[in-house]
UniProtKB/Swiss-Prot annotation:
GO terms for cellular component: chloroplast; ribonucleoprotein complex; ribosome. Probably binds the 23S rRNA. It comes from Cyanidium caldarium. This is Large ribosomal subunit protein uL4c. Residues 53-81 are annotated as: Disordered. Part of the 50S ribosomal subunit. Pfam families: Ribosomal_L4. Keywords: Chloroplast, Plastid, Ribonucleoprotein, Ribosomal protein, RNA-binding, rRNA-binding. Belongs to the universal ribosomal protein uL4 family. One of its GO terms (biological process) is translation.
Amino acid sequence: MKFMVTEQKTLIYPVINLITGQHNYIGFKCRISTNNANYVVHRVFSIQNKLSREHTASTKTKSQVRGGGKKPWKQKGTGRARAGSIRSPLWRGGGVVFGPKPKNVFFKINKKEIRLALYTVLSNALPKTTVVSSLEGLPNFISTQALIKFLRSLNVSLDNRVLIVVEKKETPLFLSCRNIKNLALIQADHLNVKSVILAQSLVVTLQALKIIYKTFNDN
């Protein structure tokens, strides 16, 4: 385990009020990694990838393959190599030796490491983060076009990967996002390192931002 050096940093976010068009500012104090930022972020990112895999690959051993109970030919006198079953691993259609089986994989990672990695990537993502006071400009019904228009008003390009972070996934918003290729929607308390790293633009509501720093607080 590498020795971590952290420092307390205040992240200042400009908040866009969509109704008045004014800009306010809000700041949050957090601890970020200084000397081993790449190490801790890579560790959390790779473990998250491993835990997201479903180890469902499965093969059958000789005893599990159907058939093969009868000896193919007698033990001696044929001139052939001796054989006891047509389901031997040496035969086509036979069992598999040491093949994959479904398994449960667990990798332990400390909560402090997750928090440190998340705050570090959020700090690096500050230039590409847009904070809005609310999503009041969006209709209460399913409308992909309205969502695209809303994002364009924030100068967010849908040619890149966009991540919208909200305090709660509302059904109309979720269904509106589903039809846009490079757009993902995530709830604030489910935010993770991988989502932030892969996104090239972040759109966060003010309430969601408060939930993020409350959920992953140092205390």
